[in-house]
Every structure is written in C-alpha cells, then in structure tokens.
C-alpha cells in the first residue's frame, strides 16, 4: 500500500491525530512540519496532497504547498521541465476550485502564468480572475498584468515620432510607413484597464508605445483632457501623441480639431503644432496643399517663433522632396519627364525660400509694426531694382500712419528717400515732392526735411529755383502767431508752423547772401527776427553781412540787439565775435570800453568769460594804461565763479603786475590771491610769492610763506617747495633754521595722513593773513629790512 511506503513508525502518532480529526488544520500542520524537517520531498508532496483532499478550502495550506512546489523548480529550465511546470498549473487550478474567492490565490496564479508569457492564457486567466475575485482585489491583479506589459512587452518600444524624412520618402514612393511593430494584445489589455485606472498618465504613455493607433485614438479621446496634470511627461507631449495617432489612422478632421484646441492651450507652440497639419497633408499625398498652407501661414503670422519653425520645416521639406525625386528618377526612367518637372518645381521653391528669407522676415516685422519706418527703410535695402524699391516706398507711405509717429524726422526722411530714387526724372520727382509737402506731418522736422531736400534738389539746377522754393514756403501768413499756437498745442499739422523753421530760414538767408542782393538779404533777416526764427548764428551772419558791406554801425547795432535777446550762456559766442568786430570798428575808445563793460557783465551770470577780460586788458595795455590793464584782470579774477578760470586770471593778473607795476602792488595781489583761493589752488601761487620775497631779501617773510605752504600738501606731493626751502635755508638760514625745516618735514610725513583739501575746510585749518608791513618802492631793501621783517604778520593759524 502507498501509505506503508511513506508512513514511518515515528509518524504513527501524527497519523492517529489526522485520522481522528481529518479536518483539523493544526494536526495536519504539525505533521507537515515534521515531514518538512526530514527533507523527504516525495513524502512531503504525498502528505500535502492527502491533507488538501481532506481540507480543500484552506488557502494557507494551499499557499504553503504551492510556494514549496514553486521553490523546487527555481533555476530549472521551463522548457526542459515543462511537465513539472504544468503540474503546478494544475495544482493552481485545483486550488481555485476550492478557493476561487480568495484574491491572493488568483494573484499568485497570475504571477505564475506570466512566467510562461502565454498571452492567450494570461488574458483568459485575467478574465476569470476578475469575474471571480471581489472588487478590492481587482487593482492588485491588474497591477501584475500591467507591470508585465510595461517591463516585458513594451520595454524595448520607443515613443514613436513622425519623421519628415520618412513622410517624404513614403509620399514619393507611394506607400505608407509600416516601420513599427503593433502590439495589439497589450493595447487591448491597456484599453480595458483604462476603464478602472485612477492614474491615467502612465497608461497613456504606455499605450502609445503599443503602436495600435486606432485603440490609442479611442483611449486618448476618452481620457485626455486639458485638466490632466501629468508628472512624468508634459501635457503637450501627450497631445502630440494623440495627434500623431490620428494622423496615422487618417483622421484628418480629428487632427485639425485637436490642433486648434492645442493652439489655444499652448499658443507658444503653435508653429510646431501646425507642422502636424502638414504631416497629415503629406500622408494624404496633398503636397501642393501643404505648400499652399505653409505659404498662407508664413505670410500671415506675426509670431517670430511660429515663423522660424514653419520656415525651417518648409525648407527641409523642399530639400527632401528634391532629393527623393532625384533618387526616384535614377531608379526609374519610365517617368523621367514628369519627375524632372517636379524636381525643377521644388528646387525653384527651395531657392526662393532661401533667397527671400530676410524679406519674409521683414514682412513679419512689418505685420507686427506697420508704422515702424526704420523697418520700411531696411526693407528698401533688400531689393536691387528701382521698381522694387519704388514699390516698397509706395507701400510704406500708404501704410504708415503719420498720427502714430513718435520719432521726429523719420517720416520726412522716408519721403525724401522716396523722392531721391527718382532724381533723374525731374517731373516725377517734383510730383512726389509736392505730395510730400502736403502730408500732415506731426513734427516740424519732417516737413523741414522735405523742403530742404526740395531746395537742394532745385539748387543743383539753379540758385534762383532754390530761392523760389523757399520764398514760397517762408511767406509769413497774416495770423502767424495764432497758427504757431495751434501747432504747439497739437491742433494743426507742421504746415501751420513751417514758415518759422529756423533750418529753412538759415538755408534761405545763406542763398540770398550768395546771390549778393544786400537789400533783399537785410529784409529777410529782419523778417526772421520779427517772427523769432533768428538763431545766434543768423544774428552773427547778419552783423558780418553788414560789416562786409560797409555798414559798420548797422553791424554793431545787430550785435547789440542779439546779445540782449539771448541768455548769457548763449550770447557768449556772439560776444566773442562782437568784441573782435568792435575792436576793429572805427568808433571811440569810450564806445569800445562800454562794449567791453557790457561783455564782462556775463561773469555775474556764471559764464566763464575769461577771454573777455583778457581782450579788455590787452585793449587797455595797448593804449598805455598799465594799471587799468591789471585792474581788469583783477576784477575778472574776483568776479568769475569758475575756479579754473579764476586761477587763470589771477596768474595773468600777477604776471602782468610784475612786468608793468611796482612790487608793492604785486605783493598785494599775491596776498589777496592766496587769501581768497582754496588751499589746494593757493599753493600754486605760494612758491612764486616766496621767490619774490627772496628776491627782495625778505628772508623771514619767505620762510613763513614756505612754512605755510608746506602744510598744504603731503611732503611727497610737494617736493618742489621742499627743494626750494632746502636751498633757501642753505643760502639764507642758520644751522637751527635748517634743523627746524627738517623737523617740520619729518613731523608732517608722520602726521599728515588726511586729505589736506578736507582739513582746509575746517575752522582751525591753516589760514593766510596778509602783511601790513610798508615796503619802500621797488629798490633794494634797506639794512633795517634785512632779516627783521615782522613775522607775526603771517599767521599760520595752527
């Protein structure tokens, strides 16, 4: 008997137990544990089968038995031990007969079956399991199957992308791409799973890898929406997958609808999205429609990114079409003539696209900014022939809205360039100029540019023609002040104020002077002054015209009027010329002095009019009034506010005093200069002053000046003074004074670590005090003076 074969003497107690209570799982478990520890696999298998015949619905025993049987087959070849694998499958079937409601049993069976990769069996088992299991176990068994699909069936499948190269190849050769493996089994399982799936994103990603386009379209149509918030990919990529699938199932209407939806969702991607419409047309063999669509979109878009994407796509499409057609013609001569015509057509299109890229880009920019004149002027440069350029100019002047211009002069320049194009055609050029002068320009400079160009154009033929043009436009209307007010308020165009154009008046007056009619020129100048169109340059020219014509008094009168009209900062340039003319004029010395006195009043307004004081001083010097000459420079040094100009005049004043006046006068000037100038500027005058005192043998005063000057700058920055002082002490000093000089330098080198300019601003800083000593004349000093100057008179203020 079989029982005698497996039951040993030590098993008898267990046998009594299981015989008495056949349905007692505990007794069976103890018995099985004993057998398991014995290591007899046949005996254990026999005992498990006996046990499960008695207790058929105990899942824990079944699970224990099945796990043990499966472990026995670990590392065994599934094909060489196929019978053993089938036995386990039968055991699972027996288990499910009794434990069909146990979810874990179905899951364990599915994991076992998946090892065989028998897709039919997996699908059938999945169906049985879902029908038998309770609802809460459905997701678990689905997870097993889905993981199998992802990790085994779709592991090598890449995300399919439409290729322009493939699309053109199949278009030329008349067939559709089949360059992908369709996994119908996986797509059907995934589609079924989508009905209960909570996380739809990974399912959409993986079902797209099955390449079952019809199923993919159905699943995407049902589950993809703008509300989806993917984490593994982007919503845009999911929509691209959807569009790609519809293209591959030839659903043109669906493609167009979804692309339109995506353009609203992803406006920054509309260029790329529209390429899928072109892919769809190419797949349908409608290459001409694809080209027309590209032409339409590129000609209408205002989006630079969309333009770039589609333009590059079109160029690549034409390149591939040309290449594939050439290759087909090489392979098949039967349609050589038709293919050659197509090659020529696409090659011409490609050439045109490459050649006209800059022009088309300019088209786009002008669609975005039609009133941008700089773009129109750039566009003109893109064409070579006069007719093409003329068309651009014509389009520009018709398109540009003068009311929206913000840059003065550009619109006028556009019209001038337009007219310049037809300079050789006098009649046409004059017609264009007439039109240009009637444009209601917003800015005066635009209309000025047109009239100036017209004048210069006429001047090439005749000066009289040029004068005639300007005399018309500069005719003063009766209500000219009212017209100017309206223009300034923006109520009238530039034509209302053109008569007051300073640029036109300048040109007109220059032409009249060249013409040589003095009376006409004077009347024109007076008219310009009357309407306040005269500039400083016009006044100067008017005065010089009078001077050159022998009307000296009138010239000076014009100068006098002009300096009264313009503010000091502007009138300085007029005074420069006025003074030169006045000096040469046949008028009295007093009149010239009056003119100079008026000129130097500009100093009170903060104008650095150094040259006026210099000219005035030279004037008095030439007359022999030496002291007055110095006084004028002295006055300028005191009155001019600009520090550099002040220093210049002090230097000239002192130099002239040394040459023309006595030493007492010069000393007073030095003292006032040093006292009034900031220390940083005063130091420039200290050394010459010290040299002067040394020359007068004023040793103590010279030493005090050097001591004062040494404290204004760091010794390293004041070497010239220290060198002089060293030589001075060598020649005039004593041993003690020389030591004191060295001590002073060492002290200053150690302590002077701050900016002396800042120190000089404080109340306790170095202060210069002028001497009150009476010096006799300019002769040599007396013995009483030698070495006995009152040194207390120079207070160092330390």
Swiss-Prot record:
The keyword Secreted does not apply. The keyword Nucleus applies. GO terms for cellular component: post-mRNA release spliceosomal complex; Prp19 complex; U2-type catalytic step 2 spliceosome. Pfam families: HAT_Syf1_CNRKL1_C, HAT_Syf1_CNRKL1_N, HAT_Syf1_M. SUPFAM superfamilies: TPR-like. SMART domains: HAT. It is found in: Nucleus. One of its GO terms (biological process) is generation of catalytic spliceosome for first transesterification step. Keywords: mRNA processing, mRNA splicing, Nucleus, Repeat, Spliceosome. It comes from the Eukaryota. HAT repeats lie at residues 5-37, 39-71, 83-115, 117-151, 392-424, 428-460, 478-514, 516-548, 550-584, 587-622, 661-695, 697-731. Belongs to the crooked-neck family. Associated with the spliceosome. Involved in pre-mRNA splicing and cell cycle progression. This is Pre-mRNA-splicing factor SYF1. It comes from Kluyveromyces lactis (strain ATCC 8585 / CBS 2359 / DSM 70799 / NBRC 1267 / NRRL Y-1140 / WM37) (Yeast).
């Amino acid at each position: 008997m079989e029982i005698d074969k497996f039951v040993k003497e030590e098993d008898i107690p267990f046998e009594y137990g299981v015989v008495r209570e056949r349905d007692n799982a505990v007794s069976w478990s103890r018995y099985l544990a004993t057998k398991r520890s014995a290591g007899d696999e046949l005996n254990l298998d026999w005992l498990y089968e006996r046990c499960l015949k008695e207790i058929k619905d105990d899942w824990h025993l079944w699970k224990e038995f099945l796990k043990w049987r499966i472990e026995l087959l670990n590392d065994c070849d599934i094909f060489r031990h196929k019978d053993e694998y089938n036995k386990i499958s039968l055991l699972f079937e027996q288990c499910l007969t009794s434990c069909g409601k146990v979810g874990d049993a179905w899951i364990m069976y599915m994991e076992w079956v998946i090892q065989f990769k028998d897709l039919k069996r997996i699908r059938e088992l999945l169906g049985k399991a879902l029908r038998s299991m309770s609802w809460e176990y459905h997701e678990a068994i689905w997870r097993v199957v889905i993981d199998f699909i992802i990790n085994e069936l779709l592991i090598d499948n890449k995300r399919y992308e439409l290729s322009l190269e493939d699309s053109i190849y199949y278009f030329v050769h008349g067939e559709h791409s089949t360059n992908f493996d369709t996994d119908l089994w996986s797509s059907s399982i995934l589609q079924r799973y989508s009905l209960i799936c909570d996380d739809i994103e990974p399912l959409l990603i993986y079902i797209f890898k099955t390449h079952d386009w019809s199923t993919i379209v159905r699943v995407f149509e049902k589950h993809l929406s703008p509300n989806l918030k993917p984490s593994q990919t982007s919503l845009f990529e999911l929509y691209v997958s959807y569009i790609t699938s519809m293209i591959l199932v030839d659903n043109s209407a669906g493609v167009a609808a979804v692309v339109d939806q995506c353009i609203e969702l992803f406006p920054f991607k509309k260029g790329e999205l529209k390429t899928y419409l072109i892919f769809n047309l190419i797949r349908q063999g409608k290459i001409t429609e694809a080209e027309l669509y590209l032409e339409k979109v590129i000609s209408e878009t205002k989006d630079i990114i969309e333009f770039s994407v589609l333009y590059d796509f079109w160029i690549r499409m034409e390149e591939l079409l040309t290449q594939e057609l050439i290759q087909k013609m090489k392979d098949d001569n039967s349609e050589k003539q038709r293919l050659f015509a197509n090659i020529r057509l696409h090659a011409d299109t490609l050439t045109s696209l490459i050649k006209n890229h800059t022009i088309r880009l300019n088209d786009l920019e002008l669609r975005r900014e039609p009133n941008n004149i700089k773009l129109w002027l750039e566009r003109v440069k893109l064409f070579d022939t006069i007719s093409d350029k003329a068309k651009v100019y014509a389009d520009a002047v018709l398109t540009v809205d003068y009311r929206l211009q913000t840059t003065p002069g550009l619109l006028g320049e556009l019209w001038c360039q337009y007219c310049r194009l037809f300079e050789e055609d006098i009649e046409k050029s004059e017609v264009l100029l007439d039109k240009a002068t009637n444009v209601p320009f917003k800015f005066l400079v635009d209309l000025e540019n047109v009239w100036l160009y017209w004048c210069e154009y006429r001047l090439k033929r005749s000066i009289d023609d040029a004068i005639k043009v300007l005399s018309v436009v500069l005719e003063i209307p009766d209500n000219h002040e009212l017209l100017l007010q309206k223009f300034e308020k923006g109520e009238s165009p530039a034509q209302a104020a053109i008569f007051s154009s300073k640029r036109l008046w300048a040109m007109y007056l220059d032409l009249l002077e060249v013409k040589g009619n003095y009376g006409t020129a004077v009347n024109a100048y007076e008219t310009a002054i009357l309407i306040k169109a005269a500039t400083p340059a016009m006044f100067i020219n008017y005065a010089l015209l009078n001077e050159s014509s022998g009307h000296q008094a009138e010239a000076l009168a014009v100068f006098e009027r002009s300096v009264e009209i313009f503010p000091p900062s502007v009138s300085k340039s007029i005074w420069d010329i006025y003074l030169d003319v006045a000096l040469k004029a046949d008028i009295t010395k007093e009149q010239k002095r009056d003119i100079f006195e008026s000129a130097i009043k500009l100093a009170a307004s903060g104008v650095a009019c150094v040259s006026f004081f210099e000219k005035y001083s030279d004037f008095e010097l030439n007359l022999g009034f030496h002291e007055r000459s110095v006084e004028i420079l002295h006055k300028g040094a005191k009155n001019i506010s600009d520090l550099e100009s002040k220093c210049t005049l002090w230097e000239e004043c002192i130099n002239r005093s040394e040459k023309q006046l006595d030493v007492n006068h010069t000393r007073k000037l030095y003292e006032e200069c040093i006292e009034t100038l900031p220390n940083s500027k005063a130091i420039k005058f200290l050394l010459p002053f010290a040299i002067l005192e040394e020359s007068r043998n004023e040793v103590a005063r010279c030493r005090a000046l050097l001591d004062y000057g040494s404290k204004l700058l760091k010794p390293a920055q004041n070497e010239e003074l220290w060198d002089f002082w060293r030589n001075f002490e060598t020649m005039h000093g004593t041993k003690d004074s020389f030591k004191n000089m060295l001590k002073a330098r060492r002290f200053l080198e150690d302590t002077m670590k701050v900016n002396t300019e800042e120190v000089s601003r404080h109340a306790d800083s170095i202060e210069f005090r002028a001497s009150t000593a009476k010096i006799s004349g300019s002769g040599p000093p007396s013995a009483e003076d030698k070495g006995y100057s009152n040194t207390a008179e120079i207070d160092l203020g330390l």
